[in-house]
């Protein structure tokens, strides 16, 4: 783990990367609202698709890479999420008029107080 080793003492959480967390760990099962990035390696892209589809529908699914790639096309066609966002992390906050409020387990149906 890379980050602030004294986070519990000063109550500040610096951006933190957790390498290869257990698939059963809280960081892999719960929604994370903080500067935490779990990084988990996969042997092949089939395993990525299987992992996504074996869990509840995500509020958002972030893809970093070429949107014309076969992998992006597979994510788009073979998975389901509240939003599929490519090469961006703040898309939902860019325009307050976007009618996005989530789906599935974490969705609440409305956004921006409307």
PLM ranges: what are they?
Residues 1-4, 62-64:
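Short beta-strand segments
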Residues 2-8, 89-90:
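Short, solvent-exposed loop/turn elements at beta->coil junctions and helix N-caps
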Residues 12-114:
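Conserved C-terminal structural/oligomerization subdomain of aldehyde/semialdehyde dehydrogenase
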């Amino acid at each position: 783990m890379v980050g602030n080793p004294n986070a519990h003492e000063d109550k500040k959480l610096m951006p933190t990367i957790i390498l290869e967390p257990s698939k059963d760990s809280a960081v892999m099962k719960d929604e994370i609202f903080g500067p935490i990035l779990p990084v988990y390696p996969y042997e092949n892209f089939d395993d990525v698709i299987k992992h996504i589809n074996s869990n509840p529908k995500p509020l958002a699914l972030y893809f970093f890479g070429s949107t014309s790639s076969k992998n992006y096309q597979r994510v788009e066609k073979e998975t389901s999420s509240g939003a599929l966002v490519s090469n961006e992390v703040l898309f939902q906050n860019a325009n307050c008029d976007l009618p996005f409020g989530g789906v599935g387990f974490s969705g609440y149906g409305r956004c921006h107080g409307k």
